[in-house]
Amino acid sequence: MDEFSENIERIALELLSNLVHGNATLSVPRNSSGNVISEYRRVSYNNRGSRHSFCVLIYMLSRVHRLQVRGGSFTVRGLYYDNPLLVRSQSRIAEARLDVCRMLRTSPLSLGILAASKGLVAGDLRLLMTNGDVLDSSLYGGPLTLPTDPEKIDRIETLAEFVLIVEKESVFESLLSRNVFGTFERRFILITGKGYPDCCTRRIVHRLTEENQLAAYILVDADPFGVEIMLVYRHGSKSMSFSSQGLTTPALRWIGLHPSEIPALGTGAVALVAGDNKKINDLLARHDLEPGVRQELRMLQDVQLKAEIESVIDFLTDDYIPNKINRNLFL
């Protein structure tokens, strides 16, 4: 029996022991900023406010245990439709999946319960699947949606020299429409996670840098949320700080937009709002910030302005991206 199954059975035995004393409670670790989780929240059947969450958690644990014993996988959507009266919404399944990850200290990919992939990719990339299928991005007329389960990718083949991640789908589509592969002299792979990336997108980027030895660059908005997205790719998600193995790219190169470039944009910048400043303070409190990233966040605080990638879209493909990559202008 594997470790996951044993941990789930341990949780079940503890719950049964508590039930003898009339206490139907599950302990779920809270988010942490490091590898040690010391705080828990109690999800109790005895409490009307958390009774539904308790039932969905039990449902999720039972399905994960079944997967570990029998093999296979479920989708978030499939789990919802298996018992819609209990679950009530797919978002409840997504929340319970993350809670189970915290309880078992693992990533969603390891559970075998999969969410639809958000990531899009274009360029020189061939994904050789374990079932024999080949997903060749160069053969598609448009972008290729990344597979839901990246662990079913047996091998990745590419002649690309690097990976370029862009924060938003709109920028991804704009670059393709401007023939970014034709105007740039070097072969590369273009990826977007459509904002905050899912585990699948982060896993693919990790594998490209580790297995294929490609450099990875990222282009995000010059605002605190863009910086946070860059940090998710680089260091992992705060909500899953307990399990980032295979999902991070520490050597990720941030080519822009840098807040220090905002003064040169002129009319392309807008004022920060209260939520932006709160996010900046949250990010500055992190202990994994590189000095250059911290300095750029301080710049945001000083100028009280932010800018989107679209503000430089007209010269992004011919000037901005090639200049940043060829001259190593990254943080």
Curated annotation (Swiss-Prot):
GO terms for molecular function: ATP binding; DNA binding; DNA topoisomerase type II (double strand cut, ATP-hydrolyzing) activity; metal ion binding. It comes from the Eukaryota. The keyword DNA-binding applies. Its EC number is 5.6.2.2. The active site is at Y81. Mg(2+) binds at E167, D221. GO terms for cellular component: nuclear chromosome. Keywords: DNA-binding, Isomerase, Magnesium, Meiosis, Metal-binding, Nucleus, Topoisomerase. Residues 1-120 form the Topo IIA-type catalytic domain. It is found in: Nucleus. It holds the Pfam family TOP6A-Spo11_Toprim. It catalyses: ATP-dependent breakage, passage and rejoining of double-stranded DNA. Its main location: nucleus. One of its GO terms (biological process) is oocyte karyosome formation. Signal peptide: none annotated. Its cofactor is Mg(2+). Gene3D superfamilies: 3.40.1360.10, Winged helix-like DNA-binding domain superfamily/Winged helix DNA-binding domain (1.10.10.10). Belongs to the TOP6A family. Required for meiotic recombination. Together with mei-P22, mediates DNA cleavage that forms the double-strand breaks (DSB) that initiate meiotic recombination. This is Meiotic recombination protein W68. It comes from Drosophila melanogaster. The gene is mei-W68.
